[in-house]
């Protein structure tokens, strides 16, 4: 008897239908073809054990299983469930009538329980697109897949429940998730707030500008000055995710297996903070089983690199392409996958090896030339992609002990949202531009033209502060964002003056001591 079951293979953040054909005839051999990897081949032993524990026997027949299309490599253990159900149906142990209406995915334990899989959300989306009535998968993935409407998502605890379902004994109920309600319920909840931080008003303002214009940012300051504390509060002032952004972000985390059992849809912008020992592959993604890296897990959110110069030079260099293109393409001999990577880069660093260069009270003990050498660990092309470079100093005791309440993140967020709305309207006819940070040099001549007083100020600053040529475009982008926060149509001299203050590392005098 020949039967078909249906599964899926995930590539990038999309899925491809895999048709599993099972033929059961007289004989005693077992064949599995269609480019399966080792984990898929090993499913034979898992299926035998799971069926025995569940009260069924693996057929003593000649079984041939073909996984089509044969040119796509089938990887991982998530095919255990469709293979097992296909074998039972081909042997006549269960009714095959409903098999063409449901997609099946799940890894089997030896006791028959179903283990969670990766990529449940993109697979569910593909199942709906292909017209399947339902998707049967491990119960721990059910809420994640139930985000997809017009699809019955049936979460099963073990293979016995799935066998009973196809045998007409019931046992599986659709998982219902009110996507919009859950999305909105958790959107405004943050564990940390800008008001937690005493002082550092200039840095808070710089973070507000960064959030409003989507600008990358680096904070330079001594240990204990609050760099990490401030960076971790940045998501609390970013505009909320739209439903489409949340869906795309959740798909990436689903493929990486990072969506929790009780989570249906990520409702807050991700904040990723990898350790400085991270490898190239962990940063951008890849591996023998392609997985999204930190740049993709931070998509629509923030990638925070603490102690930037301590990262391996090659790791920092691989950031250049996703920062420019907002996606990352991973090409290997066997595959090529594409992951979204539209993130805000926020970094922190000490000003020198000892950490106390320009400190108001503690002397720097670094030898001559070491400060510039330390800064030079970050390449010019990478620094060129960081709009805001601000120095941060320790908070004096008077500020720390101050009882006056600081401004809440919710208040700052409202200003940021208004600025983003202005930019959305400005660039609605421009494909690929959503915020000021994405403007090209050509766009600057249209949307970021300072008045004559501002031009004079900018020229004077370039000469007196020895600002580099690459700072010019960045200053104009920042001044455009600052003007948007003021809800001003034209860029004024005071907008430019503030923007110039955010370009510390461009000054030739920096690190010359």
Predicted regions, residues:
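Walker A/P-loop
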Residues: 219-260, 325
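Residues immediately C-terminal
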Residues: 110, 303-304, 310-311
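P-loop NTPase nucleotide-binding/switch module
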Residues: 170-209, 213, 240-295
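Basic, amphipathic alpha-helical bundle interface domains used for macromolecular binding and assembly
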Residues: 39-44, 59, 66-76, 289-290, ...
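The Walker A (P-loop) glycine that initiates the GxxxxGKT/S ATP-binding motif of P-loop NTPases
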Residues: 221, 285, 307
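Walker B catalytic acidic pair
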Residues: 300, 306-307, 318
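Peripheral, non-AAA+ core regions of ATP-driven protein-machinery
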Residues: 1-218, 225, 331, 471-472, ...
């Amino acid at each position: 008897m020949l039967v078909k079951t249906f599964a899926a293979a995930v590539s990038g953040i999309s899925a491809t239908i895999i048709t599993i054909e099972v033929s059961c005839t007289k004989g005693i051999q077992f064949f599995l073809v269609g480019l399966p990897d080792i984990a898929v081949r090993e499913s034979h032993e898992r299926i035998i054990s799971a069926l025995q524990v569940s009260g069924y026997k693996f057929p003593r027949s000649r079984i041939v299983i073909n996984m089509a299309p044969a040119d796509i490599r089938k990887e991982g253990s998530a095919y255990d469930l469709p293979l097992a159900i296909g074998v039972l149906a081909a042997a006549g142990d269960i009714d095959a009538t409903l098999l063409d209406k449901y997609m099946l995915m799940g890894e089997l334990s030896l006791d028959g329980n179903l283990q969670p899989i990766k990529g449940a959300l993109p697979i569910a989306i593909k199942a709906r697109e292909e017209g399947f009535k339902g998707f049967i998968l491990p119960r721990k993935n059910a809420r994640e897949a139930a985000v997809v409407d017009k699809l019955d998502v049936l979460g099963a605890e073990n293979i016995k429940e799935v066998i009973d379902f196809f045998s007409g004994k019931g046992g599986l109920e659709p998982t219902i998730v009110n996507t919009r309600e859950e999305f909105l319920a958790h959107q405004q909840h943050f564990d940390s707030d800008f008001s937690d931080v005493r002082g550092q008003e200039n840095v808070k303002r710089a973070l507000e500008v960064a959030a409003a214009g989507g600008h990358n940012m680096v904070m330079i300051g001594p240990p204990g000055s609050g760099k990490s504390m401030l960076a971790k509060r940045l998501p609390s002032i970013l505009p909320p995710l739209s439903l489409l952004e949340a869906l795309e972000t959740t798909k990436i985390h689903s493929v990486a297996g990072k969506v929790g059992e009780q989570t249906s849809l990520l409702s807050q912008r991700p904040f990723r903070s990898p350790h400085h020992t991270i490898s190239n592959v962990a940063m951008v993604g890849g591996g023998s089983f392609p997985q999204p890296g930190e740049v993709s897990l931070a998509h629509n959110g923030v990638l925070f690199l603490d102690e930037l110069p301590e990262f391996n030079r090659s790791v920092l260099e691989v950031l250049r392409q996703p920062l420019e293109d907002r996606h990352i393409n991973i090409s290997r001999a066997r595959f090529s996958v594409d992951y979204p990577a539209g993130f805000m880069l926020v970094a922190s660093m000490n000003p020198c090896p000892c950490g106390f260069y320009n400190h108001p009270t503690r002397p720097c003990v670094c030898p001559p030339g070491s400060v510039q050498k330390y800064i030079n660990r970050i390449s010019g092309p990478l620094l060129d992609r960081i709009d805001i470079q601000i120095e941060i100093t320790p908070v004096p005791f008077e500020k720390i002990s101050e009882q006056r309440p600081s401004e809440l993140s919710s208040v700052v967020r409202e200003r940021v949202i208004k600025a983003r709305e202005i930019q959305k309207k400005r660039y609605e006819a421009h494909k690929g531009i959503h915020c000021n940070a994405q403007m090209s040099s050509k766009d600057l001549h249209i949307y970021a033209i300072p008045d004559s007083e501002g031009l004079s100020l900018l020229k004077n600053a370039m000469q007196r502060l020895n600002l580099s040529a690459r700072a010019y475009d960045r200053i104009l982008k920042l001044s455009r964002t600052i003007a948007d926060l003021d809800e001003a149509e034209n860029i004024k001299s005071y907008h430019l003056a503030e923007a110039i203050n955010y370009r510390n590392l461009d000054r030739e005098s920096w690190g010359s001591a």
